[in-house]
């Protein structure tokens, strides 16, 4: 690809980039910092939050007990932020905003990955459901208790809208999932602070969203190979990974399997990043946005895979779902994790006094929906390890996740 027009940290910000000097501000007004932009302050608040530290002990596919080298939500988040920042720099966007959205995007995930989310959503169906993106919003607007003047982190409008809409509009003609109901916590907050749910998020948020796809597509392969759930031979069945493996084997015919896997992963990240940059440049040239408002008003995302890469990526995802996420050994752990969280929900909902004092306080005055949301907030904030410990404390038998 050509490096013409690529930003490397010294080029002027593009006219369609978010300008921190023109931020729409915060829900609770605050004095500006003399040393940091609003987006830098958002990033720093996210990094110093309790929710960020908890990501260290929350897993994605592999349960934490399996080993120290598998990715957690924290390591995944750092990898997403690195890719998002690289994309933003190349497209001459605000790197700090892209990084902030990337760093906060997984705050609302439960223990035990998507299994935990499914378990909580099952128990919360009668009370508005549970959605990790909506939970991320609750954390940064309500559940973090660090500041004297407000609950949450009081992030800028741009970071909040990027968090909520990084995968596309939630309502209207261009909604990413038009048949899906918007989670109640998002609708409730939107009444207080309009995040323009029918419009596309900033290019910085779009960079964070696609960086998430790039990161987990590659790194789940890395973890799957390490765990022995995937093999290089099996990856030869996937067009994208076969092409990359052929390149590696041609250049390094005697390379051992472990390094071959690493070479595959790094090449996959590189080729996807380069594809996104090239496709984004093509879409930007066609759309000719001259402002952030022009970006918001588009009918489609401007940061995206090319048609060819999107097809390859879908095939890869189908392969990973079949061979990794629903591998027999992973499914066994998923069932165990599911039972742990559902047991904890049922017990805490029936008897809130078993929760820590700050969570049980005032539960006796709450209606069922509010009490269920309180329990879901408590459980969603747990790490994998803490959820297992609590289950062992409360029950005679805890499913084995090892």
UniProtKB/Swiss-Prot annotation:
CDD domains: HDc. Residues 73-217 form the HD domain. Transmembrane segments: none annotated. Keywords: Hydrolase. GO terms for molecular function: triphosphoric monoester hydrolase activity. The keyword Magnesium does not apply. Belongs to the dGTPase family. Type 2 subfamily. NCBIfam families: dGTP_triPase, HDIG, PRK01286.1-1, PRK01286.1-3. HAMAP family: dGTPase_type2. This is Deoxyguanosinetriphosphate triphosphohydrolase-like protein. It comes from Brucella anthropi (strain ATCC 49188 / DSM 6882 / CCUG 24695 / JCM 21032 / LMG 3331 / NBRC 15819 / NCTC 12168 / Alc 37). The lineage of its organism: Bacteria, Pseudomonadati, Pseudomonadota, Alphaproteobacteria, Hyphomicrobiales.
